[in-house]
Amino acid sequence: MEEDWEQLSEQEKVPIPAKKPDVNKWDGEDEEEEVKDSWEDEDELEEKKDEEKVETPKAKPKKTLQQKIADKEKLKQEEAERRRLEKEEEDMTPEQKLAEKLRLQKLQEESDLKNALDTFGVTSIVGGIDGMHPTNKEEFIELSDAICKKLSNYKNDTEYCAFLEDLVTKLFASLPSANIRKVKGILDNLYLEKQKLEKGDKPKKKAGGKIKARLRMDGENQNFDEYAPKYDDFDEYDDFM
């Protein structure tokens, strides 16, 4: 009986055929597909993390009442300053407008130069009048020309003459009287020359005016002659006395 059971069990054991290798795939191709799948999974995880990291934009903090008042006051001041400048520009003469334009242009050029120097790390630059250190006559003439060119930008300003008076007084205060007298002579000659030029520019009087005045005087003399006999009568009275 036991032998029959053993025979039956042996018959039931059917050998499982071995799995044939897939000849259509290269060695290691399955491994690459598994690696590729793992990369895609990692990419999806990273995308999810990036989405989680994206923060919603923060709302701007609301201004306090004091900040709003300060902003309004600042706008009022800017508007008042703009109107003041416009009013001043309207009252300016063409010469003053040109001088103001040149002044603003000069300030803009200086600002641009300063920004350029800061960009290249240059802390200071010496040039122009400040860079001049004359030691002979020619160099002093160059300095004089540079100063005149600088001051000529303001010659149409209403305060220019007062500025020159103050400047000359300060410059000559430290000089000996002999030097001051010499400069005074130069200024006197310049004054006479300018006076002649100014008189030459005025229109001359017509000759007819002088003739009329002369004729009038002649007529007046004739009137005085009419009273001459009366004065003679007084002379006869003196003889009688």
Curated annotation (Swiss-Prot):
<dbReference type="GO" id="GO:0003743">
    <property type="term" value="F:translation initiation factor activity"/>
</dbReference>
<keyword id="KW-0396">Initiation factor</keyword>
<comment type="subunit">
    <text>Component of the eukaryotic translation initiation factor 3 (eIF-3) complex.</text>
</comment>
<dbReference type="InterPro" id="IPR023194">
    <property type="entry name" value="eIF3-like_dom_sf"/>
</dbReference>
<feature type="compositionally biased region" description="Acidic residues">
    <location>
        <begin position="28"/>
        <end position="45"/>
    </location>
</feature>
<protein>
    <recommendedName>
        <fullName>Eukaryotic translation initiation factor 3 subunit J</fullName>
    </recommendedName>
</protein>
<feature type="compositionally biased region" description="Basic and acidic residues">
    <location>
        <begin position="69"/>
        <end position="87"/>
    </location>
</feature>
<comment type="function">
    <text>Component of the eukaryotic translation initiation factor 3 (eIF-3) complex, which is involved in protein synthesis of a specialized repertoire of mRNAs and, together with other initiation factors, stimulates binding of mRNA and methionyl-tRNAi to the 40S ribosome. The eIF-3 complex specifically targets and initiates translation of a subset of mRNAs involved in cell proliferation.</text>
</comment>
<feature type="region of interest" description="Disordered">
    <location>
        <begin position="1"/>
        <end position="97"/>
    </location>
</feature>
<feature type="coiled-coil region">
    <location>
        <begin position="31"/>
        <end position="119"/>
    </location>
</feature>
<comment type="similarity">
    <text>Belongs to the eIF-3 subunit J family.</text>
</comment>
<keyword id="KW-0648">Protein biosynthesis</keyword>
<dbReference type="GO" id="GO:0016282">
    <property type="term" value="C:eukaryotic 43S preinitiation complex"/>
</dbReference>
<dbReference type="GO" id="GO:0001732">
    <property type="term" value="P:formation of cytoplasmic translation initiation complex"/>
</dbReference>
<dbReference type="InterPro" id="IPR013906">
    <property type="entry name" value="eIF3j"/>
</dbReference>
<keyword id="KW-0963">Cytoplasm</keyword>
<dbReference type="Pfam" id="PF08597">
    <property type="entry name" value="eIF3_subunit"/>
</dbReference>
<feature type="compositionally biased region" description="Basic and acidic residues">
    <location>
        <begin position="46"/>
        <end position="58"/>
    </location>
</feature>
<dbReference type="GO" id="GO:0033290">
    <property type="term" value="C:eukaryotic 48S preinitiation complex"/>
</dbReference>
<keyword id="KW-0175">Coiled coil</keyword>
<dbReference type="GO" id="GO:0005852">
    <property type="term" value="C:eukaryotic translation initiation factor 3 complex"/>
</dbReference>
